[in-house]
From Swiss-Prot:
This is GTPase Era. Keywords: Cell membrane, Cytoplasm, GTP-binding, Membrane, Nucleotide-binding, Ribosome biogenesis, RNA-binding, rRNA-binding. One of its GO terms (molecular function) is ribosomal small subunit binding. An essential GTPase that binds both GDP and GTP, with rapid nucleotide exchange. Plays a role in 16S rRNA processing and 30S ribosomal subunit biogenesis and possibly also in cell cycle regulation and energy metabolism. Residues 202-280 form the KH type-2 domain. It holds the Pfam family MMR_HSR1.
Length: 299
């Protein structure tokens, strides 16, 4: 039997459902999700393998107009995938009109010389007439290889999109073992799960100012639990107070919710300790960005 493989980038503005789509395809959480824009900060591979194919999806940070060094990192990280992949999924939301952000991405896609599939997500939120109007608008902007409407949240048409990708794969190598689902180490996934809970539970001023560093992660032979120590980094003392909460209640809630997800991922009992530290203006300091896992070497 001929084996086929290829790399597929998922690009789009923030909050269009890229990570939700990847997690649905993979059947488990690879990329964290929230309703906050710019939740994804790093490129994350989701490695989808069957007996006849391997599709390596690359989930990317939402492309936006950056205001910090962290924002620059995120946007360059996303665009760098255009040099690495065989196909691009350009994802747009069905319930929002085409905007300047979409046009900016389209101009880069036109210059990239790689096949682009337009994925219109969130079709569960609109009337079919609105969907058709949205598709026509984007079709007039560039020549897409395919246009596929989906609902990543409900799973509508997702398998059809995977089939289309599979049909267009070239014969190739199996780049990763069949049981490997991502390129990131467990420590990275743990830090992202803690950050996800911070995004879910705290107010608007917190999300973009938070980074999570896993200081240690090892199994305790006596308790047969994985002991994890993680530090939540913020930029201001006021943010530290919000995350800790009254009597430590918020930090305890963050830790409890994160621990459940981490246990599901690892298949082990977990003892999670979390601290909060202030690192002023870390989003504009390249050394701090590198220390917290946002390294220019990624692109």
């Amino acid at each position: 039997m001929t084996f086929k493989s290829g790399f597929v980038a998922i690009l789009g503005r923030p909050n269009v459902g890229k990570s939700t789509f990847l997690n649905h395809v993979m059947g488990q959480k690879i990329a964290i999700m929230s309703d906050k824009a710019q939740t994804t900060r790093n490129k994350i591979m989701g490695i989808y393998t069957t007996d006849k194919e391997q599709i390596v999806f690359i989930d990317t940070p939402g492309i936006h107009k950056p205001k910090t060094a962290l924002g620059d990192f995120m946007v360059e990280s996303a665009y760098s995938t255009l040099r690495e992949v065989d196909t691009v999924l350009f994802m747009v939301p069905a319930d929002e009109a085409r905007g300047k952000g979409d046009d900016m991405i389209i101009e880069r896609l036109k210059a990239a010389k790689v096949p682009v599939i337009l994925v219109v997500n969130k079709i569960d939120k609109v009337h079919p007439d609105q969907l058709l109007s949205q598709i026509d608008d984007f079709r007039n902007q560039m020549d897409f290889k395919e246009i596929v409407p989906i609902s990543a949240l409900q799973g509508n048409n997702v398998s059809r999109l995977v089939d289309i990708l599979s049909e267009n794969l070239d014969e190739g190598f199996q780049y990763f073992p069949s049981d490997q689902i991502t390129d990131h180490p467990e420590r990275f996934l743990v830090s992202e799960m803690v950050r996800e809970k911070v995004l879910h539970l705290t107010r608007e001023e917190i999300p973009h100012s938070v980074a999570v560093v896993v200081d240690s992660m090892k199994r305790d032979e006596e308790t047969d639990k994985v002991h994890i120590r993680a530090t939540i980094m913020v930029e201001r003392d006021s943010q530290k107070g919000i995350i800790i909460g009254k009597g430590g209640a918020m930090l305890k809630k963050i830790g409890s919710m994160a621990r459940r997800d981490i246990e599901l991922m690892l298949g082990d009992k977990v003892f999670l300790e979390t601290w909060v530290k202030v690192k002023k203006n870390w989003r504009d300091k390249k050394l701090d960005l590198a220390d917290f896992g946002y390294n220019e070497k990624e692109y």
